[in-house]
Amino acid sequence: MVNQTPTSHAPPGPQLDRIFAALADPTRRALIQRLDGVEELTISELARPLAMSLPAVMKHLDVLENAGLIARHKTGRSVQCRLTAGPMEDAMGWLARYQRFWTESLDRLAQALERQP
């Protein structure tokens, strides 16, 4: 049996690296989760349930914005944050290629085991 790995046209670029690095932190994942299902939240609204300072939350938001996962804009005196779909879709697409690879590999293994006496 030949070992077939997913074909890739190019290695993951720096943007994908930033996305996965941003998602690796539980606080940043919690911030994304808070933004899910709402149009926008202010930085204060995002920070309220977290046990950390506003400057610490803002650093996490900087990482998320740098990865393209959120967008911020100023409305009056407050800064609004919202999710952006594109980067998450890029990450999901990259992961989906490997999901297909592992699913096919495990299916082949199951078939080989079923043929065993």
Task: Give, region by region, the residue ranges found by the protein language model.
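Amphipathic alpha-helical dimerization/coiled-coil segments
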Residues: M1-Q15, Q33-G37, E89-P117
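Alpha-helical residues within the helix-turn-helix
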Residues: R48, K59, N66
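Exposed, low-complexity/repetitive linear segments and helix-based recognition motifs
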Residues: P14, K59-D62
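Residue-level detector of intrinsically disordered/flexible regions characterized by low predicted structural confidence
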Residues: T5-P6, L61, G76
